[in-house]
């Protein structure tokens, strides 16, 4: 017994055979620094090319500005590859949003998707409010606006005032599109028109009255006529992203509740998502050239760059400093506090998405690249990214909120208007709410700025004075928006990881049960066939209804082979 126990306690030896491909040679410890740099560049070739494209575009644009005036056709040809890149990225937005939302939500139950959405919304609202407050603090501290600056820039263009109520109602209307196909390329907007209304005429001849009214209108409106503002709804060009997201969120949740019945549909959208991501990879290899051409063409097209830099330099510095503080300090700090992980290694994983946003100035256009960075580089669960990122690209606009808060108070300072505490709070809240609905409003930047200025009673015509530097600030705030979306996905994934693991274990348990049932049915069928293999069923003309058997005839002792395909039996002679 002792010897047996000793034998049992002996360590078991396991032989592991490895192929040569599994073995890697140990790198020498003392390697040339240049060789190590080349290795890193080779592993991150696409990222290196993208960064090189941004630098090349900026340098070439600056050098070409020093040359003789360039013909507009030449500028158009320089920017043409960038225009193609933007078209390709925007082409993938619709199928990517549809497939990602449906596949992400179909893998979650109703409770999990609700908690996921709640965490995402809390993060979005918190960071957007922080960004708006930060912008207000910086613009009040730096005070870039000066009444003398207004005289240098000259008068702006008159803009129609926009009602906050109309904008809010348009937001709700676009959330529930009446035609899903139309929502792919149009969205609804309230339009105000000024109409001259004549007083009731006592003349019997209506035609003469109308002609008289038209003649008076051509010259000068008489005192009796009144100007009446009439409102109406019109469809404007532009994808109704908010409406599409709302519908497909509901579609994905409903499909997830159907379980096995919707399995085929889930597989279809999973395949669609994989196809779109394959196309994204192909487009990303073209992006370095496209981004370089975009930046180069935009720099060349700017008029009076030096004059604009002198006049609006402090305004630009205020916005850029705010974006750097928010994107480089506040967002990483929030991520570290919640997850206790290194935010800079996280940022390294999304650097490709950040540089793409900097070049394209489009959160939605960068969405395919952001998906790839988070899922492939950082290993975030696809159920989180496919739900959080499309929603975040639509409503989470930290950079936009900061920019609009700074711009509104800058215009007030430029006009010599001193805002009280209530008006400053109004600017902060309006900037937050306007940035949330920016994606579903046509001409979003202009309209949302009009909302803020109208809310605090500032002149709306001064917005046109800021357009000269918007090309740069737009890229900066878009890159911060993408960084905010990415950190949000990482935070939501960290908070939801235990729930996702529980759902995975439930799915595995369900699959094991289904596999056991299938195996049981298979075993029963096999046993049934084996029990019937020794039996022969005689019918007319010696036909049988079994697969195959070999029997001995009692009449003459000869054997016979029988099968379903062969009847009557072939008797052996």
UniProtKB/Swiss-Prot annotation:
Membrane topology, record value: Multi-pass membrane protein
PROSITE patterns for this protein: NA_DICARBOXYL_SYMP_1, NA_DICARBOXYL_SYMP_2
SUPFAM superfamilies: Proton glutamate symport protein (SSF118215)
Intramembrane stretches (start-end): 344-374, 424-457
Binding residue positions for Na(+) 2: 394
Chain segments annotated as transmembrane: 45-64, 88-108, 121-142, 235-258, 268-295, 317-338, 384-410, 471-492
Regions of compositional bias (Basic and acidic residues) in chain numbering: 14-29
Residue numbers on the Cytoplasmic membrane side: 1-44
Catalysed reactions listed for this entry: K(+)(in) + L-glutamate(out) + 3 Na(+)(out) + H(+)(out) = K(+)(out) + L-glutamate(in) + 3 Na(+)(in) + H(+)(in); D-aspartate(out) + K(+)(in) + 3 Na(+)(out) + H(+)(out) = D-aspartate(in) + K(+)(out) + 3 Na(+)(in) + H(+)(in); K(+)(in) + L-aspartate(out) + 3 Na(+)(out) + H(+)(out) = K(+)(out) + L-aspartate(in) + 3 Na(+)(in) + H(+)(in)
GO biological process: adult behavior; cellular response to cocaine; D-aspartate import across plasma membrane; glutathione biosynthetic process; L-aspartate import across plasma membrane; L-aspartate transmembrane transport; L-glutamate import across plasma membrane; L-glutamate transmembrane transport
Annotated Gene3D superfamilies: Sodium:dicarboxylate symporter (1.10.3860.10)
Residue spans of biased composition, Polar residues class: 1-11
Tissue: Localized in brain and is highly enriched in the Purkinje cell layer in cerebellum.
Lipid moiety-binding residues (S-palmitoyl cysteine): 38
Binding site for L-aspartate: 361-363, 400, 441-445, 474, 481
Residues bearing the modification Phosphotyrosine: 538
Keywords for this protein: Amino-acid transport, Cell membrane, Chloride, Glycoprotein, Lipoprotein, Membrane, Metal-binding, Palmitate, Phosphoprotein, Potassium, Sodium, Symport, Transmembrane, Transmembrane helix, Transport
Family the entry assigns: Belongs to the dicarboxylate/amino acid:cation symporter (DAACS) (TC 2.A.23) family. SLC1A2 subfamily.
Function: Sodium-dependent, high-affinity amino acid transporter that mediates the uptake of L-glutamate and also L-aspartate and D-aspartate. Functions as a symporter that transports one amino acid molecule together with two or three Na(+) ions and one proton, in parallel with the counter-transport of one K(+) ion. Mediates Cl(-) flux that is not coupled to amino acid transport; this avoids the accumulation of negative charges due to aspartate and Na(+) symport. Essential for the rapid removal of released glutamate from the synaptic cleft, and for terminating the postsynaptic action of glutamate.
PANTHER family linked to this entry: EXCITATORY AMINO ACID TRANSPORTER 2 (PTHR11958:SF93), SODIUM/DICARBOXYLATE SYMPORTER-RELATED (PTHR11958)
Domains as described in the record: Contains eight transmembrane regions plus two helical hairpins that dip into the membrane. These helical hairpin structures play an important role in the transport process. The first enters the membrane from the cytoplasmic side, the second one from the extracellular side. During the transport cycle, the regions involved in amino acid transport, and especially the helical hairpins, move vertically by about 15-18 Angstroms, alternating between exposure to the aqueous phase and reinsertion in the lipid bilayer. In contrast, the regions involved in trimerization do not move.
Protein known as: Excitatory amino acid transporter 2
Organism: Rattus norvegicus (Rat)
Lineage: Eukaryota, Metazoa, Chordata, Craniata, Vertebrata
Gene of this entry: Slc1a2
